[in-house]
């Protein structure tokens, strides 16, 4: 009887993989992602439309999300409102834990919203996404609360130019 091989996704967490390997010790395990990644990259017209719809919902949510921002609000207060906004717009919820960062926290790409309060001159960063019809959106936006300082403008322009050069 030929050896059985189980293909495993590259993102499968160890807490799932280890018990699977223990339960099926007679099988060999191999990375299965290359066999499906190429197929997943090809999207039908219908899938592309669903992806665009999820992104459009995220665009609408971002407009409403920015309207919630006010001096003295905490990152956590703003982040907690997002789930309801997504549901009102027809999404089933977040596609990942939202990142809402004020001030120095905006420099941490994996910052989790906390009780930091927004104050004049802060950088505000939103990294949010929704799940709609099993498709996910992801959007990051950075803006300044009130007017940026000269140094903030300089850094912003440097990052913007680097981003544009990277996409050219």
Identify the function of each model-found stretch.
Residues 1-168:
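Active-site neighborhoods and metal-handling regions in enzymes and metal-associated proteins
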């Amino acid at each position: 009887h030929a050896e059985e091989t189980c293909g495993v996704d590259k993102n499968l967490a160890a807490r799932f993989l280890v018990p699977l390997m223990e339960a099926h010790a007679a099988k060999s395990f191999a990375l299965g992602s290359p066999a499906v990644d190429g197929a997943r990259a090809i999207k039908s017209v219908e899938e592309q439309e669903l992806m665009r719809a999820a992104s459009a919902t995220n665009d609408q949510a971002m407009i409403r999300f920015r309207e919630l921002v006010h001096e003295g609000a905490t990152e956590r207060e703003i982040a907690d409102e997002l789930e309801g906004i997504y549901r009102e717009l027809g999404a089933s919820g977040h596609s990942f834990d939202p990142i809402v960062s004020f001030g120095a926290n905006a420099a941490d790409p994996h910052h989790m919203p906390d009780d930091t309060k927004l104050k004049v001159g802060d950088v505000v960063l939103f990294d949010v996404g929704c799940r709609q019809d099993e498709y996910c959106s992801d959007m990051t936006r950075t803006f300044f609360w009130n007017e940026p300082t000269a140094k903030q403008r300089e850094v912003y322009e440097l990052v913007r130019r680097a981003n544009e050069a990277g996409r050219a």
